[in-house]
Amino acid sequence: MNALDEHPSAVPQGVTLLRRHAVAFFILGLLNNMMYVVILTAALEILPSHVPTGILAFVNIAPAVVSKALFPYYFKGEIWYGWRVWACTLGSFCGMMCIAFFPGLFLRLVGIGIASFASGLGEITFLQYATRYPHQVTTYCIGWFASGTGAAGLIGASAWWIVRPLGVRGGLGLLSLLSFGTALSFFVILPLPSIMSRSTDETTEALMQDSDREPERNLSLSFSDKVQLLKPMLIPYIMPLICVYFAEYTINQGVAPTLLFTVPDSKQHKLLSMIIHSLRDYYPLYQLVYQAFVFISRSYTSILP
């Protein structure tokens, strides 16, 4: 149940603001993760035939992990969200353009790393920004952001299928323009936290009220302080999630590329023969099916009842 379900009598202004939050965070999650999926799905076209896809998979995720570990724990003080959003937008665009227009393996891996770092920075930035809203609005935004990251898999894999005939240069060059949708969504569609706090309508206030919320205080935590906060969550929450994601990505990126079958005959498998024309078509198809179910699993708090 989301915030709209809990307060069906919300005034039009409050409903409109929440819908803008939903649309904005869905787009932010979608575009932030979409390039990662596009690169992964296009792995066989991006890399030379003699290079294993595991190299691309590593470069596509390692910089994102570094950015997620670096920024929350080592940087203190006020977050400049505007600068971060532009850094994510331009980083994603430049990374994709580097992959598209430089045929050399090294420069393509550099481009993949830049796009990956931008994606990791974007994820923590948008989740941190969601906490600037009242509590119930924060959970509402995070639910739609998660749904957007799930849709990124489905739409990203589908997008590569559509632009694949254009080749790496044309296809990735065209998709790189979508990166600017991140800035558009953040600066134009997403309401400012100050707009939410100025609302005085009693129904809208009920929508955002959190009776347990303490007055805001400016805190500057050191790295050791943040580690102390992390320790109680490590065993019961973080380690199980690490195991789940490790198994998931091992299967998806390590095992799936090795599962190949003969090209289907049009007489025996009419539907599959329309989709699969060569052995290289299997992996993108695996990604499309996989990402479809990722979207379903990440939408149970927002879109799905």
Segments and roles (model prediction):
Residues 57-65, 134-186, 287-294:
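Glycine-rich segments within core transmembrane alpha-helices of 12-TM secondary carriers
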